[in-house]
Amino acid sequence: MKPTILLYDSGMGGLTIYDAIRQTLPNAHYLYCFDNAYFPYSERSENVLIEQAVKIVQKIAEKYPLDMVVVACNTASTVVLPALREKFAFPIVGTVPAIKPAAAISQTKTIGLLATKGTVERPYVAELIEKYAKDCIVEKIGTTTLVELVEEKIRTGNVDQDRLSKVVAEWQTHPTLDTVILGCTHFPLVKQELQQLLPNVKYFIDPGNGIANRVSALLSESVPEEPEQNKENIAFCTKIDEEFFKREVIMQQWGFKRLELLNFL
């Protein structure tokens, strides 16, 4: 049997995690939900994030037997994992800022955490820094603007360079910053633009490969001799808006057969 893996995020940034997992497990069956009715998650309360996580996973699991859920969002992962693991028997993998590898690789021991405001302010992240980067200076930028810029790039192919530059302005002249953690699954999609704006930064760290390895370790993938029926990769959204058909084309380009509305009624 092909393992069925559900990934979800508030937007399409989690596609960076999907892409990393797909390269490791190309024959798995993928479902992807972006919770656009509650985008961006960084502006939602912890209770709302937990409620949405349970509703999304429950609804999709009713129709598709799931082998794994990947919370492809840093902000949600700092909050929802205990609730999901308590309710569901299949493995739940989260996405957290790659503070440990960043602290290990930084030569100047000066790290930048680029994430959403919600992620930057979570006590969980402070605990990770205390545990793995105690000997480092950790500079933080919490931004919702960059999430919006990435969603715009996904839809149009264009990036507003002026707005992007303003987001990281305080780091552009930083004398010792050599490592930046891309602490939101959206941000690897503007890695090249960030490299141009921050030429003194040697390392940009994102969690994609680490998560792919973790998922692979938890799943034993078996490739069937005959193609399985009814195993199409399907994407879901939680609200239909004027961008629906454009998003459907984008999801098809990423290997999903169609985009459906996830109806909770």
UniProtKB/Swiss-Prot annotation:
PROSITE patterns: ASP_GLU_RACEMASE_1 (PS00923), ASP_GLU_RACEMASE_2 (PS00924). Pfam families: Asp_Glu_race (PF01177). Pathway: Cell wall biogenesis; peptidoglycan biosynthesis. It catalyses: L-glutamate = D-glutamate. Gene3D superfamilies: 3.40.50.1860. SUPFAM superfamilies: Aspartate/glutamate racemase (SSF53681). GO terms for biological process: cell wall organization; peptidoglycan biosynthetic process; regulation of cell shape. GO terms for molecular function: glutamate racemase activity. Provides the (R)-glutamate required for cell wall biosynthesis. This is Glutamate racemase.
